[in-house]
Amino acid sequence: MTTRRQNTPNAARRSDASRRAILTAAFELVGEVGYAKLSIEGIAARAGVGKQTIYRWWPSKGAVLFDAFLMLGEGEGGEAALPDTGDLEADLKLVMRATVDELNDPRFDEPMRALSTEISHDPDLAAVYRERLDGPMREIKKRRLEAAQRAGQLAEDLDLDMAVDVLWGPLLNRWLQRTGPLTPEYADKLIETALNGLRHRR
Amino acid sequence: MTTRRQNTPNAARRSDASRRAILTAAFELVGEVGYAKLSIEGIAARAGVGKQTIYRWWPSKGAVLFDAFLMLGEGEGGEAALPDTGDLEADLKLVMRATVDELNDPRFDEPMRALSTEISHDPDLAAVYRERLDGPMREIKKRRLEAAQRAGQLAEDLDLDMAVDVLWGPLLNRWLQRTGPLTPEYADKLIETALNGLRHRR
């Protein structure tokens, strides 16, 4: 339990506890039953709150799930950075292998697919996702690439947003579209191929 | 109308016409109402057939939609090939710009998102998709890259499956996850970045 200021009213404390219970329930449930069968009723039952409590704070199950992902992200802290040992290729392989592990983890796989599905079909949710989750993560990646660019390891005219897409896009698409298994070897080869490019080097 | 062999029974002809009507209805409807609201009832009404006719041939709306995509693909012929002018970069830009146009076309956008969602959540459908749609398209792409590799334009040790992922994965992920607009300029820059790689060339 965290220490709380004395003037925090009990109601606000209860409200915060309910909120966390609801988000945890949504995240667990979507992993167990899938997004299609996720319901506000089910989340309410699992969290031990009334349906109306959920509807007071969120307009839809997609919105609940999205906040559940945000809560997960908060634990990682606002000052997150990718590793920087000076060896860009090794650092990126480490990060990409960790992403492979996460995507292969059954606790994350189904909730993340559910979120991706919602984003694919809902431009408004996609805009919120870009602003609150994808955007900040992208900045963290770009900061690492920028350091490499300053060190002369990346092309001077490289567009860092495109670089992020070329590094992470193939893995995410392979995962979402199930075009092949996600393995550490795939992660390594992806980094090598993106860094070196497809062209024959003369 | 195509010429038919004389011994084709009327029943088989009617059956083929119903099949095509159902698939066309499924494709049109998913674009209008989205996948969540697509129903066997709706497809049957639009196609002018009974629900039981659909259930006799397909177990689910996802299966109907998948066959609708296959029917669409059949029109493109089995001998499809990417352009080969000898200029790989120009040829790939042409292809990638055509993909951008297709993904931006409202007639295709929603049905293709619906199919992607189904694939993401259904490993069995994903396996059929890989075998019957993604696999053949991937072979066509690899054939063009192989020609470039033989011509000494691509790295000798390049894994062509990885090359396909690095070229197309970022665009497909950007489209599905709505991380940014799909433009001809994006298509061009993606090809250039994938071919040249991210590294500074000394």
Q: What function would you assign to each model-found segment?
A:
Chain A
Residues 1-46, 63:
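Basic, helix-initiating cap at the start of DNA-binding domains
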Residues 22, 37, 60-65, 75-79, ...:
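Short amphipathic alpha-helical segment with a characteristic S/N-K-E followed by hydrophobic residues
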Residues 90, 106, 110, 123-150:
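Amphipathic alpha-helical packing segments from all-alpha helical-bundle domains
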Residues 97-104, 112-121, 193-198:
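Helix-loop "lid/cap" segments that line or gate small-molecule binding pockets
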